[in-house]
Amino acid sequence: MSTARAGDRLFTLLQQCLPTRLLSLGMYGLTRVRWKPFKNLFIRVFMKGFGIRLDEAIETKPEAFVDFNAFFTRALQPSARPLAAAPALLSPVDGTLSQFGPLQAGRLLQAKGHDYDAASLLADTADAARFTGGDFATIYLAPYNYHRIHMPLSGRLSGW
């Protein structure tokens, strides 16, 4: 994990102060614009501003992405993130460990300074009870981080 940049902390602080729902709706629309002059400029400005390189990506040409969202969630080459030999602790994402600690009475401090209930996050009270007394970790994905989430190869995704 990399250390948190000052810009990351400022970005997180701004997210707490701004009308996030409205901001999210606006960004959702902007990231799906397919008009080539706009999306190509948007991608190039973003790449330059955050120092993003595409040498690890399967698609290495910025203009080849259908929209900004396709660029932002780009796939990496299989060799880009080799797994460590067992036994090892692996992160499911690129990012910075921002918070960690014990689950206290089903509650945990989670994303962007908001307190969340484990049952709400898992959408199941019985599943949440299994984690009582356990620990949590929050990994912050900065704009320059790879934005796909991975799970262990031996895992089984049984719900969304």
Predicted regions and their residues:
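Non-catalytic terminal segments and appended small domains
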Residues: M1-W160
